[in-house]
Amino acid sequence: MSNTVRAISPDITLFNKTLTFQEISQNTREAVIYIHGGAWNDPENTPNDFNQLANTIKSMDTESTVCQYSIEYRLSPEITNPRNLYDAVSNITRLVKEKGLTNINMVGHSVGATFIWQILAALKDPQEKMSEAQLQMLGLLQIVKRVFLLDGIYSLKELLVEYPEYDCFTRLAFPDGIQMYEEEPSRVMPYVKKALSRFSIDMHLVHSYSDELLTLRQTNCLISCLQDYQLSFKLYLDDLGLHNDVYKNGKVAKYIFDNIC
């Protein structure tokens, strides 16, 4: 897999695989940036996962008020977390600069939602101690208006309690153990609260009742922590298909469009 990735692009962050579903125009008010999932390691999940959903949003956007992009990142085991997170952050930052984007809406599915959650927790480290990638996360928080977390993974502890067999992919992304995942909700919620408040970011949680790979346990775990800190969020539960149907679902597209326009 790693040889295939390197052959595709000399850019290790794969920026040249960024997809444009809807280009910026003079009427653009909102930018949507998609981050695909795939358990950190599945090459079958790509930026093109969101093609159908993005085209549905484009068909609704009769006044061309939205632009839409989807970014790529390297996979495990070639690299481990947080390096793949940093790939995503680097590519989003570059896209924002090249296109002059403001009013960002980040949409992540599965591990893509995990990445967004990790970005929201960026304030866990003092700014003077932040790495370049962490400073980029801080910069993104300043222009992100909404996040849409679709059937996401938020707590690796809860994930492996419910699905011990998922260790087959978590150990690829976290070879030194899931304790290296620093964004367990119960641990970072004070910093997420600070970010949501300071930067006025709206959080949307979406989950399909028919998801065969993730039950509601992940979403409910996150909701419990959000409620403990009395944080505002919106929840959309529906039959949105199987896990890999969610990012194609027309009802999800309408939910996103209705909440950004």
UniProtKB/Swiss-Prot annotation:
Record-level Gene Ontology MF annotations: arylformamidase activity
Active site residues of this protein: 110 (nucleophile), 211, 243
Coiled-coil stretches: none
A Pfam family hit: Abhydrolase_3
EC number: 3.5.1.9
Phosphoserine modified-residue sites: 9
Keywords tagged on the record: Hydrolase, Phosphoprotein, Tryptophan catabolism
The record's note on its domains: The main chain amide nitrogen atoms of the second glycine and its adjacent residue in the HGGXW motif define the oxyanion hole, and stabilize the oxyanion that forms during the nucleophilic attack by the catalytic serine during substrate cleavage.
Function: Catalyzes the hydrolysis of N-formyl-L-kynurenine to L-kynurenine, the second step in the kynurenine pathway of tryptophan degradation. Kynurenine may be further oxidized to nicotinic acid, NAD(H) and NADP(H). Required for elimination of toxic metabolites.
Similarity remark: Belongs to the kynurenine formamidase family.
Subunit organization: Homodimer.
Stated name of the protein: Kynurenine formamidase
